[in-house]
């Protein structure tokens, strides 16, 4: 349970897991999410760190 590492001090029975697939609800945020939603780090297409491959002719 690496996701909840910061909640270690709490007792386990008290910690409720988030339900997956439940969107919105009472306190839905109005702001639209960015490109990748709620994920902090997206390791996909980063333009910066790619070396250019030499094409073989």
Swiss-Prot record:
Entry's localization field? Nucleus; Chromosome
Annotated GO CC locations: nucleosome; nucleus
InterPro entries from the xrefs? Protamine_P1
Question: Is Kinase set as a keyword in this record?
Answer: no
Some GO term, biological process aspect, for this entry: which one? sperm DNA condensation
Keywords (A to Z) from UniProt: Chromosome, Developmental protein, Differentiation, DNA condensation, DNA-binding, Nucleosome core, Nucleus, Spermatogenesis
Coiled-coil ranges per UniProt: none
Q: Does the keyword Nucleus apply?
A: yes
Gene Ontology terms for molecular function: DNA binding
What tissues is it present in? Testis.
Positions of region (Disordered): 1-57
- What's this protein's function? Protamines substitute for histones in the chromatin of sperm during the haploid phase of spermatogenesis. They compact sperm DNA into a highly condensed, stable and inactive complex.
Family (UniProt): Belongs to the protamine P1 family.
Supply the name of the protein. Answer: Sperm protamine P1-type
